[in-house]
Amino acid sequence: MFKSLRLLVFRPNSIGANYIMENETIKSLFSFFLMIWFINHLLIMLVGGNVKYWKVIYPLSIDQYIGFSLFPYILNFSSIILISIFIAFLCWANFNIWTEVKFTKLLKVSLILTCLQQIPDFIRLFLLYPIQFLYVYSPFWAKAIYDSLKFIASISEIYIAFLFIVLLYKLTKVNRLGIAIFVIVVLLGVTELQNIFIQSIS
């Protein structure tokens, strides 16, 4: 999985996109996402952060044994998976107008996107604790490093969208500009739906 992602990130057009589609399965992609999601949320707990749905409190019987509310984490994980399936369905409905493509392949592309979106969060969270430690001794440099990480994260989100476009093009061979417009609309639309959902349950 690590080799597939490395090739996709650094050599997407030549071999990366085709390699990850041919060598990874839905199971391997889901397993990788589960691993990095778990690590990310463990890091969030260690640095004292909150998950996206932290205001939604629904007591579970297991909470008294683990010392925190588990429901926001379950909701966060479930929402990411459902969004991934929803994006795959939108891609399937759209691209089957022009060409025949299996839903399972588009689900793989959507899961790849989901995995990629977790990586910048992992890097940021992994470095957040050292930055907090540095802030005690040098607030200026700590803030400068943190702002740099935010900038890199913003750039990485754009590059991840580009990789999503490359994967869809390699799979469907539909017009690149059309795919780019579709991806922008879908990602912005999904983000807006997430925000509406968060506001409605908070």
PLM regions and their residue ranges:
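Hydrophobic alpha-helical transmembrane segments
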Residues: 76-91, 154-161
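N-terminal juxtamembrane cytosolic/stromal segments of multi-pass membrane proteins
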Residues: 1-70
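Hydrophobic alpha-helical transmembrane segments and adjacent short intramembrane/lumenal linkers
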Residues: 99-201
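Helix-loop junctions at the membrane interface of multi-pass solute transporters
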Residues: 19-20, 92-98, 167-170
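Interfacial helix-start motif at the membrane-water boundary
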Residues: 62-84
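Membrane-interface interhelical loops and short amphipathic "cap" helices
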Residues: 52-70, 132-142, 198-202
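Membrane-helix interface/capping segments
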Residues: 52-58, 84-101
